[in-house]
Amino acid sequence: MYIGAFQDTLFVDMLEYFGWVTVGKEYLDIYRPNGVPVAPNAVAASISGKEEMKQDNQTSTDSMSTSTQQETDASNEDIERAMDTDNGLDKAMSGGQGVFGTEEDDSSTKDASKPEEADPFLVEFLGEDDPRKPWNWSFSKKTFVIVQLMVLTCINYMGSSIYTPGQEQIQHEFHVGHVVGTLNLSMYVLGYAIGPIIFSPLSEVSSIGRMPLYLWTFILFTILQVACALVRNIAGLVILRFITGILCSPVLATGGASVGDVCFPRYVPRFLGAWAVGAVAAPVMAPILGAAMVVAKDWRWIFWLMLFMCGATLLSIIFFFPETSHECILHRRAKRLRKLTGDDRYYTKKEKQEEALPVSVFIKNTLWRPIKMIALEPIILAFDVYIALCYGAFYLFFEAFPIVFAGIYHFTLVEVGLAFLGFCVGCVFAYTALIIFQEKVIRKKFLEGKFRPELFLILAMCLGWCLPFSLFFFGWTARIHWILPIIAELFFVLSVFNLFQATFSYLAVCYPEYVASVFAGNGLCRGAFAAAFPLFGKAMYDRLSTKKYPVAWGSTLIGFITVVLSLIPFVLYKYGPALRARSRFSPDS
């Protein structure tokens, strides 16, 4: 039972590799009944076609019975067409060209319309209800997979900021200053900004998929926590933090794609939002755990705690996290058929496409295209700068909080960590606003047939004021009462979280064929800003501080910049269609 339910997990892969289990025998009766190769989709399509014709005839007979029934049928057809449009948009938001593994569905539909031309050696899903297709997994299995994704994402994001409560001890032990001590945070963030440039395209290769990248990099990530806990010099710690940042990046970059692999397209935005809540909440919860370790033991126990959390998560993933990429699942099916039958003619469409793609072209698209699109596309450049500054401002709070809560209110190390929980409360409000916007604006426009990509920007336009307000409010109320800076956190998350969701949805729809490159470039910009801001943050606050307002002018400086950048959604709402029409990468050009 376990083998059947989790046949594409690492543990089952190992059992299969050593010959202790055989997976895929059930497909022999489907693809080679009586030893003769057949195209199972052709048979399924023929049967499906007859059933659909019968249903159409019955529907037309019933529809002539009363005019009321005709109106109901017409209304249902309108809703179905709107849902089809909804699904199409969600596929575009998911990456169009396979970022969420939806290519095979279109091709399967096209092949089904011409069963006489079906290739008996072409391996595809056995119709839309194929039980091995992740969309058709049981609800409990889908939930378990998504929960594992969220836990894995949270732990990797925790790795960035869990270190911060122990920074003073590290500086004292290794006799270094604040900037060098902060490098351990910055290099980790820079690592997970660079990693997606390499790992995101690899996750789209059908012979690799997502699960092996998540697992093998996380295994190395877990092992290196031991090295971080035992290191004896600051240079070694900085290097280890950079490497672990790179290793944690696969799930941070493509975890959303795995959510899309598992969920039906129309539900993807909701679950992506929930996954993003974990990505925001994890870095702000980590300082609480780090502070507890520093108070109870010392800074090295921060990494021992990371080791224990990683180890428990790793066991779950090894045994229960299956491959989710649709194309990789088909590749595995074809590979098993080739092995079981001894016939090398079984293949998938993705395999043929990859064989025809030169390695040099793949590398060029991977490394150069994200930078090229930033340089040539004003829409991408504008939002990359905007989001990068927001992300940098987020990491500035790790420098500002000790100044405010420890310096002014004399909070303990653990209490300073607890002050970050305002961001978590803000996530609840932010996610609620996102769901309301999707239902009341986006979905409504779909049903009316009036959707256009710029509608996503309404969310950023409505909440854009919250970002500069939160920075001004945080800076100028810091000495009034400790609760006021925490309230500012709510407004910050409300704005930044929904800016991210609106921007990523907008960019994905504008550039569906190049969404992986768009997001890789955006991640690089975000990581670069987030790595740099903590390095100069304390110096900025110290230079601009006054006795009464220690963080006011520093926060105000960033706040004024965000005021200017908050105009970007308004400008692109008006001029976005014209810019897309002149783009060399947009399908609207």
From Swiss-Prot:
Induction details: Expression is regulated by the transcription factors AP1 and PDR1.
Segments of skewed composition (Basic and acidic residues): 107-116
Biological-process GO terms, alphabetical: xenobiotic detoxification by transmembrane export across the plasma membrane
Pfam families found in the cross-reference section: MFS_1
Membrane listed as a keyword: yes
A GO term for molecular function: fluconazole transmembrane transporter activity
PROSITE patterns to which the protein is assigned, alphabetical: MFS
Keyword DNA repair (UniProt): no
Membrane-topology annotation of the record: Multi-pass membrane protein
Subcellular localization(s) per the UniProt record: Cell membrane
Entry keywords, A to Z: Cell membrane, Glycoprotein, Membrane, Transmembrane, Transmembrane helix, Transport
Ranges of Low complexity composition bias in the record: 56-73
Glycosylated sites: N57, N136
GO-annotated cellular components: plasma membrane
InterPro entries, sorted: MFS, MFS_dom, MFS_trans_sf, Multidrug-R
Transmembrane segments: 143-163, 179-199, 211-231, 234-254, 275-295, 301-321, 378-398, 417-437, 455-475, 480-500, 516-536, 551-571
Region (Disordered): 50-116
Function: Multidrug transporter that confers resistance to 5-flucytosine (5-FC) and clotrimazole. Further confers azole drug resistance. Plays direct roles in extrusion of 5-flucytosine and clotrimazole.
Family: Belongs to the major facilitator superfamily.
Name of the protein in its database record: Multidrug transporter FLR2
Organism per entry: Candida glabrata (strain ATCC 2001 / BCRC 20586 / JCM 3761 / NBRC 0622 / NRRL Y-65 / CBS 138) (Yeast)
UniProt lineage: Eukaryota, Fungi, Dikarya, Ascomycota, Saccharomycotina
Gene: FLR2
